[in-house]
From Swiss-Prot:
InterPro entries: G-protein_beta_WD-40_rep (IPR020472), WD40/YVTN_repeat-like_dom_sf (IPR015943), WD40_repeat_CS (IPR019775), WD40_repeat_dom_sf (IPR036322), WD40_rpt (IPR001680), WDR31 (IPR040066)
Organism this protein belongs to: Homo sapiens
WD repeat residue intervals: 53-90, 94-132, 137-175, 179-217, 221-264, 269-311, 315-353
Name of this protein: WD repeat-containing protein 31
Entries under PANTHER family matching the protein: SPERMATID WD-REPEAT PROTEIN, WD REPEAT-CONTAINING PROTEIN 31
Annotated keywords: Repeat, WD repeat
Amino acid sequence: MLLLRCQLKQAPPQKVSFRFCVVMGKQQSKLKHSTYKYGRPDEIIEERIQTKAFQEYSPAHMDTVSVVAALNSDLCVSGGKDKTVVAYNWKTGNVVKRFKGHEHEITKVACIPKSSQFFSASRDRMVMMWDLHGSSQPRQQLCGHAMVVTGLAVSPDSSQLCTGSRDNTLLLWDVVTGQSVERASVSRNVVTHLCWVPREPYILQTSEDKTLRLWDSRGLQVAHMFPAKQHIQTYCEVSVDGHKCISCSNGFGGEGCEATLWDLRQTRNRICEYKGHFQTVASCVFLPRALALMPLIATSSHDCKVKIWNQDTGACLFTLSLDGSGPLTSLAVGDAISLLCASFNRGIHLLRMDHSQGLELQEVAAF
């Protein structure tokens, strides 16, 4: 193991140890070189390069993976350039089912809570509804957008679906009937992502016009516009309690490339920014508290890095570089200690958080 150190202030060397997590399933063990940075409590930033074994499962997709989402504590659903939606057991390393029907790349997936059903969106302008326990054919096909569909969000009670597109339009659908019930359009509002606020009638939406909007699903009207950012907003995520949200910015060379924490309550102010990526931040998640002593968020970027941040202070606590993976496109929480990260070149990465000796994030499998 080669240890590189970049010190902000002098401190005695510390012992470095690594753990290996075994994941069962059809797999092959391979050696992988990975780089990560760790922000120690004494404010020293250590960059470490390690060679370790990780598990390579049978692949979920044969091309770039655009999106991944957790269906339940064992299964994820993903989509990509191969036009296929895949249900995968990431704990055993097995494909559960493949769903085919789209004519072009999958752009988004959204799962119905506590259900075996989920939706997919595509560059073919279609949205399809699938059932893990049904046939491999779509249960519903929703057609209403004039351009690629780039946003999907299911209401907390699972009765409605909101879709957004590059055609500047949002549509609200009745999940049972598959009929469109509301339509709204805002000039230059090229939708990049949608997220429904838990226990509320509100939908959060990011746009290429650099704006984060809050929509009221009752009539599908804009309820609030947050202050515009300097760069395209690529993604948004809402906390489980519905009090906060994160938006992500595109960028290059460290310009832009940040995530921003916003207050969704009365003030609706910007709370904190997370800066440290060097290319577009494509995804973000609020992490389960689990064993952590502080609230954490994670971001993934086109710079091949996943970062974990202190939600309250904006300090970067850990950086994992998934070398050779290309741009990281999507991030999802698998369980209390596991993350799923989709990539251009190496499929989906299974990452584990370890709190036993300070915070560490390790890649334990890829599929």
